[in-house]
């Protein structure tokens, strides 16, 4: 290479760089590195979408021009001098010549495949490209994995024996097919829930296991149930094939199979797509990983964008090793780290960096910003979930009074059931809010079902609620029979319940009369128990005797487990109601209280409201002020992660995602004790809080000396005898030496758990007794109100004023003086 060629290549690179001078150096490098495999490790808030857009634009304008020493056109001193002059004084009229001189095999739009994870992201990519480049950008293949695969299959699925005009079955279609198969095989849906079967089949397809391989695997292991599921899987595939239909898993599976089995088809697409870009690569599963490799031709021009520290969808099949092993899969791969953050303050980033640094399975990067230090992260230790909710809502109200908008605030939690106490506090204070990616607690179907049971028990004349739950769970009382009973009730001017109780009197109800009367007897038995039992315990009986809990337990899929948690969480609402010292602490009083707050749900300004969501739902979003609640061991990280390194690292990544949603302030809360799913347990701070450096946070209400809780392993997953009890496991506290921030508290199963012991009897207290509380200090008991197997006590504390506490829950923290 002579001097002129060196000058030209250097000038060409600098001229192209001028188009992207507004990008930071690493972003610019990600745009201009066009050839070969490239891993873009894009930290939270680092502007990865901007890099993707500009990278595609660069490929269409200049092709390999920024990343090659090739000179495809004859050059002279004039061409080199022109580019050097353009660099010194770029003029718009010079651009056409500059682009001609700098372009080396510019890509045509249809030669670029950009894979995103959502249709919205694909649409945004095309829209921004069109604004930048004009209509030619619309021919870029910007699509989700499924959409891209459908286009491939519409052209070539006949090679697999399908007609190109295949049908795509959605989840409801697949459910109907499974239900028909269960009938054909004589299998009960209770034993083989449809959702579970579809989940198992989906997993098998994701692992590229055919029905025959699946059956053989589980026959060898002697698993009768899985072998039966294998037969369902086989018939399911047959029925879809007969209907010339694919489900969502088939779309990618058949594309991979096609590309693996047909060299001509594979070569066609490898030649067609000169450049492949895949966003959110950390969330890809095994099939998507295989597909990416099959589409990448000999040129090896695959660019994957992702953040291993934000891989949080393992439960959906995402495999973090896809991004961690990218450089091993593509030997000559280059890696560029996007570490400059444009969203958060340095204190927030330092805290998040410190937390995620404890993970071993990561590539490693450190986020930084020019936004300034900002406020330290606030950690607040509250007494219980009600205090936590009141603190968060109070803080948000304070910001609002100082001029902030409601919409500037977001509250994140690990699981949907945690929204209950927060919603109660928002409604009580008339603060507008919305739930994203979920349904408000009292609007959830299972919660409405249980409230309907309580309403009918309280008022059997409530025909509306009665019709809702008479056949939930199924009692084989058909809709036609209910309509007949309703007609009789209307003719006689009596409530529907009166007819149901004596259904055998009416010949037209003969087919369902016995089952109707059984239901009526159930309601009457529960009505008699209502006055005998404390309200929380009574609710537990309703859940058991109605068969509702058993119904959810038998389904035993992810959705049913979530619904079961919500049914359990309603017990927490009842306890919170009782602790609020209501005028009418009866079932009727609770139902009135619920009705009042649910009626306040409608908001006049749906846009300007506080956002509540799970941490998973928050991915990709950002807010000025973020509150991360439930930072307790056993809640976050959850108990399922204890002792499982991969699960624990996934939880830590989820914490990192939650923390990096915040722009200006980040507040994280934990409690000393939490009632969740109807059970109250003492809590210790999440290990993730302990991993935040002292210089980046302020901890309000932190107990000194620090207490560590040791738990037994006897978590009571059944509900027999569990209602209204203080804890599912016993605990003890032990003094722990103060440790430095640089060396976080070490957590192991051995130090957190202790052997189970019998539940301690209730402390005997009377009005006038002096007590000391570990959080509230010294105080005097004002009143003691027995409540079933518990008691509600009112204590006037010297420092914090009057508090109402359930004695079972508070007993561990109280000492009688």
Residue ranges and their predicted role:
Residues 1-14, 70-103, 694-774, 780-785, ...:
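Acidic, low-complexity intrinsically disordered tails
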Residues 22, 86-97, 145-149, 227-275, ...:
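Conserved helicase/translocase P-loop NTPase motor core
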Residues 218-222, 405, 419-431, 444, ...:
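Conserved helicase C-terminal RecA-like lobe
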Residues 49-52, 67, 75-76, 81, ...:
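Helicase P-loop NTPase motor core
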């Amino acid at each position: 290479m002579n001097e002129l060629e060196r000058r030209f290549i250097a000038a060409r690179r600098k001229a192209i760089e001028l188009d992207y001078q507004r990008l930071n150096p690493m972003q610019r490098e990600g745009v201009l590195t066009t050839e070969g495999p490239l891993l873009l490790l894009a930290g939270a808030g680092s502007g990865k979408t901007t890099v993707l857009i500009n990278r595609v634009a660069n490929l269409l304008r200049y092709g390999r021009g920024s990343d090659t020493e090739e000179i495809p056109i004859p050059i002279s001193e004039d061409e080199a001098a022109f580019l050097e002059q353009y660099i010194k004084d770029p003029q718009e009229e010079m651009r056409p010549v500059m682009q001609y001189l700098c372009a080396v095999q510019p890509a045509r739009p249809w030669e670029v495949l950009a894979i995103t994870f959502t249709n919205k992201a694909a649409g945004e990519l095309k829209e921004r490209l069109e604004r930048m480049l004009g209509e030619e950008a619309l021919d870029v293949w910007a699509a989700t994995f499924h959409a891209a695969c459908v286009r491939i299959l519409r052209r070539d699925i006949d090679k697999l024996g399908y007609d190109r005009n295949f049908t795509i079955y959605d989840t409801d279609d697949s459910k109907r097919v499974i239900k028909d198969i269960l009938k054909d095989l004589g299998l009960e849906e209770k034993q083989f829930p449809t959702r579970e079967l579809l989940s198992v089949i989906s997993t098998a397809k994701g692992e590229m296991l055919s029905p025959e391989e699946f059956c053989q695997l589980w026959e060898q292991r002697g698993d009768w149930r899985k072998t039966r599921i294998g037969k369902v899987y086989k018939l399911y595939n047959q029925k879809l094939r007969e209907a010339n239909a694919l489900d969502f898993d088939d779309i990618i599976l058949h594309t991979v199979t096609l590309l693996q089995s047909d060299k001509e088809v594979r070569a066609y697409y490898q030649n067609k797509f000169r450049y492949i870009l895949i966003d959110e690569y950390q969330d890809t599963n095994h099939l998507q990983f295989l597909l990416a490799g099959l589409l990448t031709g000999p040129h090896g021009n695959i660019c994957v964008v992702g953040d291993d520290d934000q891989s949080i969808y393992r439960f959906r099949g995402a495999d973090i090793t896809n991004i961690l092993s990218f450089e091993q899969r593509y030997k000559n791969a280059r890696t560029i780290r996007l570490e400059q953050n444009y969203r958060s303050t340095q204190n927030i980033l330092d805290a998040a960096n410190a937390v995620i640094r404890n993970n071993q399975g990561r590539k490693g990067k450190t986020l930084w910003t020019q936004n300034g230090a900002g406020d330290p992260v606030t950690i607040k230790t509250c007494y219980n979930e009600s205090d936590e909710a009141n603190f968060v809502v109070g803080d948000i109200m304070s910001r609002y009074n100082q001029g902030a908008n409601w919409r500037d605030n977001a509250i994140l939690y690990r699981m949907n059931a945690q929204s209950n106490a927060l919603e109660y506090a928002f409604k009580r204070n008339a603060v507008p809010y919305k739930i994203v990616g979920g349904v408000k607690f009292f609007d959830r179907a299972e919660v409405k079902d249980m409230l309907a049971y309580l309403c009918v028990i309280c008022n059997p004349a409530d025909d509306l609620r009665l019709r809702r739950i008479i056949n939930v769970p199924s009692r084989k009382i058909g809709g036609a029979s209910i309509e007949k009973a309703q007609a009789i009730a209307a003719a006689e001017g009596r409530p529907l319940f009166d007819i149901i109780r004596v259904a055998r009197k009416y010949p037209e109800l003969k087919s369902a009369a016995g089952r109707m009367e059984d239901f009526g007897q159930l309601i009457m038995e529960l009505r008699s128990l209502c006055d005998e039992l404390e309200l929380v315990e009574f609710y537990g009986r309703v859940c058991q005797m109605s068969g509702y809990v058993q119904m959810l337990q038998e389904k035993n899929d992810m959705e049913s487990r979530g619904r079961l948690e919500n049914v359990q969480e309603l017990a927490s609402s009842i306890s919170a109601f009782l602790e609020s010292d209501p005028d009418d602490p009866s079932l009727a009083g609770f139902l009135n209280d619920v009705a009042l707050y649910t009626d306040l749900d409608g908001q006049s300004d749906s846009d300007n409201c506080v956002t509540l969501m799970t941490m998973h739902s928050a991915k990709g979003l950002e807010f000025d002020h973020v509150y991360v609640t439930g930072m307790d061991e056993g809640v976050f990280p959850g108990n399922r992660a204890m002792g499982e390194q991969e699960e624990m690292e996934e939880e830590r990544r989820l914490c990192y995602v939650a923390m990096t949603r915040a722009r200006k302030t980040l507040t994280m809360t934990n409690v000393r004790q939490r009632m969740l799913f109807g059970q109250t347990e003492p809590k210790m701070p999440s290990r993730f809080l302990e991993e935040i450096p002292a210089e980046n946070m302020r901890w309000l209400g932190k107990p000194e000396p620090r207490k560590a809780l040791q738990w037994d392993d006897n978590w009571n997953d059944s509900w027999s005898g569990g209602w209204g009890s203080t804890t599912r496991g016993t605990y003890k506290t032990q003094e722990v030496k103060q440790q430095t921030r640089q060396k976080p508290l070490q957590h192991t199963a051995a130090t957190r758990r202790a052997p189970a012991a019998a539940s301690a009897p209730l402390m005997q207290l009377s009005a006038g007794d002096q007590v000391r509380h570990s959080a509230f200090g010294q105080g005097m008991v004002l009143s003691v109100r027995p409540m079933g197997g518990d008691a509600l006590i009112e204590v006037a504390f010297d420092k914090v004023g009057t508090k109402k506490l359930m004695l079972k829950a508070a007993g561990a923290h109280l000492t009688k003086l």
